[in-house]
Amino acid sequence: MMTALETRLSVADGTHAAALRQRLQAALAECRRELARGACPEHFQFLQQQARALEGGLGILSQLTED
């Protein structure tokens, strides 16, 4: 049984997966820019966790779309 996300990602034209990938990549790029600027230790740790979560999301998306 496929999840709702897997169903949406299985659409033949792949527009949903491409749009989702683009949004995740943009969010990750912004997070990395903030990390490069520096922050207080608590905010820096939060940004690192956010970057790891976004990278994980991109990895899952790649597995689901078999890129």
UniProtKB/Swiss-Prot annotation:
BP terms from Gene Ontology: protein secretion by the type III secretion system
Effect noted on mutating G57D: Complete loss of ability to lyse macrophages
Annotated protein name in UniProt: Type 3 secretion system chaperone PscE
Major localization class: cytoplasm
Disruption outcome: Deletion mutant looses the capacity to lyse macrophages, indicating the absence of a functional T3SS.
Highest taxon, organism lineage: Bacteria
Family named by the database record: Belongs to the YscE family.
Cellular compartments per GO CC: cytoplasm
